[in-house]
Structures are given as C-alpha cells and as structure tokens.
Regions:
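Alpha/propeptide regions of enzymes that mature by internal proteolysis
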Residues: 1-264
Length: 264
C-alpha cells in the first residue's frame, strides 16, 4: 500500500529518481484484536494516508485501537517541546504508540500510582481486568527541525527510553522499544549535480537541549495516550480500562475514606 501511494504521488520514482523503501513498524495487539483475521486491508491504509493532517486525534484509534499500556488502555499519544538555540526557535515533537509496561510500575508526574490502581482493579471494581507484564512494544517517532547528522539523531532517539522510564517502564524481557528520530533540516534533492554537499550541523555543546526535550516529550506523549484512550472490550471479552476512569474511581474511593475517617 505504501509503495502504491508513493508511486501515485511521484511519477519520477524508478525513472528519474530512486526506488521506494517504506518503513513500517509493528505492535502486537493480540490481547484485544483478532490478528488472525487480518482485518486491515489496503484501502484502510490508503484512506489513512489520504486523511493525514497536522491535527489528529489521540488515544485508542488507528494503530492505537488495540494497544494496552501499563495494563490499561493505551494507544496514540503526542507531545512537543520548543527550543531556543542561539536565539533561534526550534521544535522537537514526539509521536508514541504505547503498548508496554505493567500497571504496578505506572508513574505519573513522579507519583507512583500503579499499586493503588492495581489494588482497585483487583478488588472487583471492574470486570475483565487481567494483569499485564512489562512486555509488548512501544514505538516512538521523534521529529525536529534542528540540523543533526545521523550519529546525533541516533543519540537523541536513545533518550526516548529516559521518557519511558519516567512513566514506570523497566524495559522488560519481552518488551520491544523502537525509537526513530529524523530531522527536516538539510533537504537533499535527488538531482543535485554538485560533487560536494555542505550541511549545517548542531554543535554538540548544545545537544543536551535535544536530550532533555526527547525525554520530556516522550514521557508526556505516553501519558497523553493513556489519558485520551477510552475503555475497550476486545476479542473473547478481553477488556482494557481507561486511565481516566481508574483515576476517577480512585479519587472517589479516597474521598469516601476521608469522610469515613472524619466520622470516626
């Protein structure tokens, strides 16, 4: 589907320019989705490409439909950071497909809320809960307009793991973390006749700004996926509960406990 789309958008492919090498990532959603049914067809992919825009929904839609994150409903999340380098504004954005982590480890803004959430779900508050080990997959795509070379891009992409760890991910044995970083700076034309090319490149004395931005944006994107996701019942009655519902129930429970204490 991606090859067909690229060919339709660029008649010069394989004639005046190179071939198509699409990049496709994958997350296992078999807990909620009947993956043996192969329900996604080429027309669905082409429709998604046609409707792609700068604004998009987050949570449990598209590739995020069958995702679970920290034992709750996961999905698509995004975030960004603005950077000032030598008086010039730059940006770094993160797009995350969150399908990883265990509930007992979940941490939000430094608060380790996982055990309380797990206790609530195990108490029978909601049906269909099944514990999730720290496994699955997470895909992080980082985009920036800061001019970086391939080594610098690789270094920035590795800082996505710092953001994942802030939410409680310990990168379990069966968890596949994939992070890709690209820069929109230094465009390369396929028909440039010049024998040499001169590109801008960030002085690495400033690269810590990118490292921090990558970690912060990844952390926030994972949390955004969790907060935007809605509860879903999938195949065989498997259910993934939304973080928003769990937090509301925890708040109600703690309010009731506080009232009971005052009455005593």
């Amino acid at each position: 589907a991606l090859c067909r789309h690229a060919l339709s958008q660029n008649p010069g492919i394989c004639l005046t320019t190179g071939t198509v090498n699409p990049v496709v990532f994958e997350c296992n959603d078999s807990y909620l989705n009947d993956i043996r049914g192969l329900h996604i067809k080429e027309e669905h992919v082409l429709s998604a490409l046609k409707n792609a825009s700068q604004t998009f929904e987050e949570g449990s839609l598209g590739a995020g439909r069958g995702m679970r994150c920290h034992g709750l409903k996961g999905g698509i999340g995004s975030s960004s950071r603005m950077l000032d380098i030598a008086g010039h504004p730059y940006a770094l954005g993160a797009l995350v497909l969150a399908n990883h982590g265990s509930l007992s480890d979940l941490t939000i803004a430094g608060r380790h809320i996982g055990p309380r959430a797990e206790e609530l779900l195990n108490s029978g508050w909601a049906s269909g809960y099944e514990q999730q080990q720290d496994k699955g997959s997470v895909i992080v795509v980082l985009a920036t307009d800061v001019p970086l070379d391939s080594i610098q891009l690789r270094r920035v992409s590795r800082r996505a793991v710092a953001g994942l760890s802030r939410t409680g991910s310990n990168i379990g044995h069966s968890s596949g973390e994939i992070a890709l970083c690209f820069s929109t700076a230094n465009p390369i034309t396929h028909d440039d006749p010049a024998p040499f090319r001169q590109n801008l490149q960030l002085n690495e004395a400033h690269i810590d700004l990118l490292f921090r931005a990558a970690a912060e944006a990844t952390e926030e994107a994972v949390l955004s996926a969790l907060f935007h996701a809605r509860s879903l019942t999938g195949r065989d009655g498997h259910r993934a509960h939304a973080l928003s519902e769990v937090l509301a129930a925890l708040e109600e429970k703690e309010t009731q406990q506080a009232q009971d204490q005052r009455m005593i």
